[in-house]
Amino acid sequence: MGNYCALLFGGNSCSCRYVLTSSIVDVFLLPFFRRHCAHTLWRAVFSATGFKVQSLQRNVVEMKEKYDDYYDEIPHRCSIGNNFNANTTCEIVFEVEEDMSPPILIHYELTNFHQNHRGYYQSRDDYQLLGRVHNQDPVSKNRCEPLNYLGGIQLNPCGFAANTFFNDVFKLVEGRDADGFNLTMLEKGIAWQSDLDYAFAQPDGFRSALCPQNGTVCDKSCCTGVDTEGEYAGLEWSCDEPYKVKEDECYRYFYPNDNTTQYLHETYKGIISPLEGVTNEHFVVWMRTATQPTFRKLYGWIDQPIRKGERLVFEVTLNYVVSRFRGSKSLIVSTNNIFGGENPYLGPSFYWIGFYCLLAGTFFAVKQLVRPRKLADPKHLHFKLD
């Protein structure tokens, strides 16, 4: 009995060695317990976890507006059909139905877009994304075809992933927080920091600087002029016009081989800043390809509480066509929990695993009762004597 005690409770203490001494315990209970407690234990663990996950999911507040869909019989007011880079605007309005606590996440959702296709997610040059300008290796060059050159001009970055970037623009134009202050949608901190640190960098040789007179010179002379002194003395700039960050703050910049290369800010003018290029966080988020044809990607977040009944208005600049891949696009505003956003399948998946463990445990328990099998019965051993 002491051996059973050690197996059940650990150790070899006398306090438990002589308590369970009946023949029923020795012959039936202990082998039965050791065989079937695992099923019961896992059923309890998964069922309890499922209830907890489901309760957390119920606390998620989510609002979703589909604003363009190939299958709409009556086109949405924000639909642009096959009009690529339409650059038109429309408004999407949300009425907040429950109090929302920060962080409040802003996602866009695409359907029927297969970023998980091998030919799509391999169509990229990771060395190029890290800043290499010259000497594209044959493997990367082959993977980027047919989007490696465009009319004799090299695309940087090349490939399907970079050149199908989602370029609709969302701007929060109306809404107040619980204290009555205007809401601000933040667009920094949405990409993985490891991607920003180790996977994306401006081209080798890139540089930027404030225009003369602390950035107040915002005409073409900022780009065409050559400094006679200072850090950039004698250096030329590749920009045609300076990039205006805000009023009275303009920057000049230089991209290597600009005459023979089309960079990301030139492919997506007005969407990607030339000062950021491939380090733009919206682009970095896009380049982390999704595993399913229907996916969401983080666009921004709000770090202020919002009360029930508040009205949120987003201005959308429409550029991205979904009719070519027979999909749709949506804007989503939601809170989250430790498991992420709303997921109706996560909690039930734990229920079903717990239910399976219950069925399996019941089946083997009945089998043991009907046709018991003694543990380590030598008659079940088959071996050949030499």
Please annotate each region the language model reported.
Residues G2-E91, L331-I332, G340-N343:
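N-terminal leader/pro-regions and domain N-caps
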Residues V53-Y70, F113-D126, S323-R326:
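Juxtamembrane interfacial secondary-structure elements that flank transmembrane helices
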Residues F51-V61, F113, T362-P372, A376:
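Transmembrane helix-loop junctions and nearby membrane-interface residues
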Residues M1-C16, I106, D377-D386:
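Non-transmembrane, juxtamembrane loop and terminal tail segments
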